[in-house]
Amino acid sequence: MKFNAVVRTDLGKGASRRLRLTEKFPAIIYGGEAAPVAIELLHSDVINQMDKPEFYEGIILVIDGQEVAVKPQDIQRHVFKPKVEHMDFKRV
């Protein structure tokens, strides 16, 4: 399972809110030897795959042409809407 991701340069609460208005959501990749990376993902791509067990076993994120193997560590969902607010990924 592969998803395209973009590195975020604009960080913070306001930037995250603006990002969510464009049908994307913020996420972070951490773990391993590399430094943590803030990314953005397209909501429609991810939400359609979250009900499959393979999603939680490990996925591939394509960031600037480089593939990174990750596993979802934490998912923050909207209280009553079927939306993802933020995700944490751990490098595998």
Curated annotation (Swiss-Prot):
Q: List the GO terms this entry assigns under cellular component, sorted alphabetically.
A: cytosolic large ribosomal subunit
Keyword Ribosomal protein assigned: yes
Q: Which domain of life is it from?
A: Bacteria
Biological process (GO) annotations held by this record are: translation
Which Pfam families does the entry mention?
Ribosomal_L25p
InterPro entries associated with the record: Rbsml_bL25/Gln-tRNA_synth_N, Ribosomal_bL25/Gln-tRNA_synth, Ribosomal_bL25_short, Ribosomal_L25_dom, Ribosomal_uL5_bac-type
Entry-linked SUPFAM superfamilies: Ribosomal protein L25-like
Entry's Gene Ontology molecular function annotations = 5S rRNA binding; structural constituent of ribosome
**Which keywords does this Swiss-Prot/TrEMBL entry list?**
Ribonucleoprotein, Ribosomal protein, RNA-binding, rRNA-binding
Q: How does it assemble?
A: Part of the 50S ribosomal subunit; part of the 5S rRNA/L5/L18/L25 subcomplex. Contacts the 5S rRNA. Binds to the 5S rRNA independently of L5 and L18.
What does this protein do, in the record's words? This is one of the proteins that binds to the 5S RNA in the ribosome where it forms part of the central protuberance.
Similarity comment text for this entry: Belongs to the bacterial ribosomal protein bL25 family.
Give the protein's recorded name.
Large ribosomal subunit protein bL25
Please give the organism. Photobacterium profundum (strain SS9)
